[in-house]
Amino acid sequence: MIAITPEQTALIPIYREKWRQIGLSIAPIDRPQATAAINTAYNIIGYPEPEIIFCDSPYIALQAIEPLRIRDSGLGMASEIRNKIHNELYDILRSQLGRQLENKIYSQLYNPLYAQLMNQLHLHVKDEVYVKLAKKLGGRFQRFLIDQAYHNNSIVSELSACHGSWVDFCIGVLNLEYDRPLYSAFKSLVENCGWIYPFEQKCFVCDRPIQLHFDSEYLLHAEGQAAIEFADKLSV
């Protein structure tokens, strides 16, 4: 197992900030690059390239997904992608880290990013999306919610950015061995896509927010306006 030097440890905040910026990007996604990222992911898991539907927000995507049936879009592919690309990549890197070093990297890279990207941004957006869907779907919402929870068919860009921080650090600073095609596919997904809802025949790719506002403590906050806003006016 490897050891980490003080000089390498000093780079942790730089990688944390790098991936915070990626996770909080408000730049519109580049659709050709996003398309290439999705097609590469499907190729890796052995499936044909899907029809890709771009959506201004997760709310728009879930509205489109709700009435679909398996015959319309195929089975959910998120677990296939996570297992083949994300988890295999993580396992290769973890196998070279001792438990103590892994915990140190997680506590200083992954955990702080998770607190901001997932506990703030992701959960705020998810809660608002479900509130709006509940109003729109009425009696169908509870069944849809259960179906979403059961299938868990999404790849969340904020969570991928949290993982990207320690993966990037392990490769770029610790020089661990890794699978280049898997890392390239992983990095392309997180850098070029927002939330992803992948099915066998169709893949819904959400754009990023167009506005994010934070206070001096990096907490979501805005006076007199939404702290988070998407192009379709979904806002929190």
Question: Regions from the language model: what does each represent?
Answer:
Residues 1-236:
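Short, glycine-biased loop/turn motifs at secondary-structure junctions and
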